Amino acid sequence: MVLEVEDEFSSVWRQVGVALERTGLYVVDSDRDQGTYVFRYGDRAGTGGKEILMEVHLLARESNLTLLTVHRH
């Protein structure tokens, strides 16, 4: 799945970080230069007690267009 956001990378980067924190997901690592956040979630998501690492990738396509993808780390 790819989410297309009509905003510049720096703004989307901040918004994604805030959204992850507000939803209670634990950010394990982030790299703004690479455009990645790695976060973990656990049993609340129905994983049977196992924690799963997920990764959000941000890619600036144009000056005001950023693409987001999410997948297992």
Where are these regions (language model features)?
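Ser/Thr-rich, low-complexity intrinsically disordered terminal regions
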Residues: 1-73
